[in-house]
Amino acid sequence: MRVYIIIWIILSMGFRAAAQDKLLVAGSGNPNILLLDKQTGKVEWQHALEKGEECNAVALTQKGEILYSYKRGAKLVTWDHQVVWDYKTPDKTELQSATLLQNGGVLLGICGVPAQFIELDKKGKEVNKVTLNLEVERPHSQFRQVFQLRNSNYL
């Protein structure tokens, strides 16, 4: 049985009620991204992942769009499931982490040889790239989550 990795994001914007009453959930092995009512556990919205889209990170943008990473890329989608942008990674890489930046952009953590941290603008276009030699040959073993600190360093 697959272990589900649940990523909880307390929504910064309301969706049919106060943000603290909702939970945006995704996980490795779960075929959907879900918006749950915390009180009732009722699914209020769901986005079906495409075959092979193992979601390990999900977030709600300031505009109210849903950002998520999948094994071979990251997507930004609307509540009506329209794809705003889809960033695909090269062969022999994995994308485990997609996090929001303070400027409204996105930070991607791409596992591969070499590994890369890539910053995208709000439209999904590359604006910065950092290449890393982690001395770990298997991309799947490199890292899971990447964040940018207020001083612009990466964690």
Show which residues each predicted segment covers.
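Bacterial Sec-dependent N-terminal signal peptides
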Residues: 1-20
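Secretory-pathway ectodomains
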Residues: 20-155
